[in-house]
């Protein structure tokens, strides 16, 4: 007999053995089922159903948690985008404040010559335009003269006695403060009354 014929014979005998093993396993499984009473089968089915229901509940719980997590992430992202929009110009606003300060200092001086008076009016209009642009972009001016001192909004540069005012009243403003959408960009530098 050739090698190929031997191989074919061996394969056929293996197939017959495998088929016999499968048939034996099926018979023993069906025999085992027949041996179980209807009550036992029902009990096993109930146990299986209970396990499946528990798994289903667990998956529902995990799905709800994942949904809540996604909602929290979405809200956090919206808040971050909103803050980026609101406070994105904060650095720009801080850099403009010294310009406003310089213009305001220049406007405090008395001017007598007609040309200088016209120049002062031009500077006043420029300052007003600059302040209006800042207001349009959410930058608010803090000029707290006469208000109560608030360390969150004001920086005390000096204290003076003055019986006409209550303690912690802002008597004078060295430098105005500014807020951007409710956040302090620069605290107002003030003189407060301390009797």
Curated annotation (Swiss-Prot):
It comes from the Bacteria. InterPro entries: GrpE, GrpE_coiled_coil, GrpE_head. It is found in: Cytoplasm. GO terms for biological process: protein folding. GO terms for cellular component: cytosol. Pfam families: GrpE. GO terms for molecular function: adenyl-nucleotide exchange factor activity; protein homodimerization activity; protein-folding chaperone binding; unfolded protein binding. Gene3D superfamilies: 3.90.20.20, Head domain of nucleotide exchange factor GrpE (2.30.22.10). The keyword Chaperone applies. The keyword Membrane does not apply. Its main location: cytoplasm. Keywords: Chaperone, Cytoplasm, Stress response. HAMAP family: GrpE (MF_01151). Homodimer. Belongs to the GrpE family. Participates actively in the response to hyperosmotic and heat shock by preventing the aggregation of stress-denatured proteins, in association with DnaK and GrpE. It is the nucleotide exchange factor for DnaK and may function as a thermosensor. Unfolded proteins bind initially to DnaJ; upon interaction with the DnaJ-bound protein, DnaK hydrolyzes its bound ATP, resulting in the formation of a stable complex. GrpE releases ADP from DnaK; ATP binding to DnaK triggers the release of the substrate protein, thus completing the reaction cycle. NCBIfam families: PRK14139.1 (NF010737), PRK14140.1 (NF010738), PRK14148.1 (NF010746), PRK14150.1 (NF010748). PANTHER family: GRPE PROTEIN (PTHR21237), GRPE PROTEIN HOMOLOG, MITOCHONDRIAL (PTHR21237:SF23). This is Protein GrpE. The lineage of its organism: Bacteria, Pseudomonadati, Pseudomonadota, Gammaproteobacteria, Thiotrichales.
